[in-house]
Swiss-Prot record:
Protein's GO biological process: carbohydrate metabolic process; pentose-phosphate shunt
Similarity-based family: Belongs to the transaldolase family. Type 1 subfamily.
Keywords: Cytoplasm, Pentose shunt, Schiff base, Transferase
Record bears the keyword tRNA-binding: no
Protein name: Transaldolase
Subunit structure, interactors included: Homodimer.
Coiled-coil intervals, chain numbering: none
InterPro entries reported in the protein's UniProt record: Aldolase_TIM, TAL/FSA, Transaldolase_1, Transaldolase_AS
Enzyme Commission designation: 2.2.1.2
Cell location: Cytoplasm
Amino acid sequence: MTTQLDALKQMTVVVADTGDIEAMKLYKPQDATTNPSLILSASALPQYVSLIDDAVAYAKAKSSDKAQQLIDAEDKLAVNIGLEILKLVPGRISTEVDARLSYDIQGTIEKARKIIALYNEAGVANDRILIKVASTWQGIRAAEVLEKEGINCNLTLLFSQAQARACAEAGVYLISPFVGRILDWYKANSDKQEYAPAEDPGVISVTQIYNYYKQYGYKTVVMGASFRNIGEITELAGCDRLTIAPPLLKQLQENEAPLARKLEYKGEVQTRPAPMTEAEFYWEHNADPMAVEKLAEGIRKFAADIEKLEAMLAAKL
């Protein structure tokens, strides 16, 4: 019998949402995504000690200034983990820009160039890397510049149709619209606690974004992210890509129920609307309280995990 994971791989590129190298070996994803929270949890694993030590040695050799050493060690550690993962996936690794730069266009551009340079120095070409950037207006503008330089971006923490539209209009390579965190918000802010997969507000959001992109012929890849259960995943079968954490990959691998394609746009490609202005972006994005709260919360959480990572590295510098 075919497992649901194998069936899903026939219609969707499956990506592992983890920094755990053992999981890569087990589930054989095409790509992998990391973020500050995943780097933090991965850095606690014993097999990563040498990667941390290497990042610390690199930072000490590069600068005598403690603050600069911390920044350099943090960037090098993220790349070191990415390099290990790239030995196991045939496709791309997503490495995230410091979330504290989420509202800083130039800062994001410079950090992305630095991450790319570290990968290039290790012999990895740009076409195996995605730079993850939060889907703020500033992050989207930074990604627009980076894409023109041949640096492909993964726009993350995406919760609103406004964010999705602005990303497509900026020509970004890939977006990561979140599913589970949208469901979390609706559960926390209403009496309804149970949702059938087709009624899940996160599933509905990604479905709408997928159809919008195909309707207007945008090439930006839609990669659903942040899943709470396999029902959300199977309801998005056919999405360009889905990034899935190891526990859910395990469930899909152990499940042999038939899997039908759910996302497929068969209509005509239509004439695109004029690009959104900054004012239109903020008006539309801020009209959705879920998107506003979840974007801000996501940035805060990633920033907090970066600070924990820095504390761990600072103790070694």
